[in-house]
Amino acid sequence: MKYLPSHTAKCLSTGKRNLIGLIVPSLSTYFSLEIIRGVAEGVSDTQYELVLYTTGLSEYNEQIYLRAINGDLVDGIIVVLPRDHKENYLHSAHEIPIIAVDYSGIEIQYPRITATNVMGAYEGTKYLISLGHKRIGFITGLMDLGCSQERLQGFIQAMEEAGLEIDESLIGNGYFTRISGEIIAKEWLSRTIKPTAIFCSNDEMALGVMDVAENLNIKVPAELSLMGFDDINEARIRKPSL
């Protein structure tokens, strides 16, 4: 007779579930999808299975994740883009391993994987300035995310070092979504005096800006320099590429 072990019985005997939880803010962004794909590839050759949670910015969901982090559902958890005003649940984990991805809030005792947000935005802005741009727009991400705050910080630092005026009307509050990039771009690119360059805090918003520019027959990069932050697949294959 072939024996198929019971997952439930194994959990009871070992105290482990062989499950890793992955919390992402959304399933509708390329950033989240690439994170999911990367984590799934990472666990594919292990004894672990992946359990996916999406917050949808819901307080109810947050309570579910609190249980998960306390070890009721999974053996370890990866949290992507935890919001700065909601990091209390990160401090609720006791013995369960946890990793925070792109978290720049208050200090936590867990490992963090973050992009070089300040330096990346600083270097990108310096590059736009080196092309001769002075009227540069900047589209932020959600401002209760540390990564958004740091990217704005890098932009401001580069502008100030170059002695360039920071026009508050050219700092747009985006949401890391394509549509938010489109909405801001429609307003900016309809002005009599337009920005000559736009830096977006992620590639998805930059793609939204590019869509609007194409509809208005504004050539990128000949008439508008455009920069994103992420290097997602669509941004690489789009013509022109970001």
Residue ranges and their predicted role:
Residues 1-18, 153, 159:
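N-terminal helix-turn-helix DNA-binding module of bacterial transcription factors
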Residues 15-126, 130, 188-190, 194:
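Alpha-helical recognition/docking segments in bacterial nutrient-uptake
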Residues 21, 78, 137-138, 199:
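Conserved beta-strand positions in the central sheet of alpha/beta enzyme cores
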Residues 25-34, 52-61, 103, 113-123, ...:
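Hinge/beta->alpha junction and helix N-cap segments in small-molecule ligand-binding domains
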Residues 89-96, 157, 209-218:
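Glycosyltransferases and closely related glycan-assembly transferases
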Residues 184-242:
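Flexible loop/turn connectors
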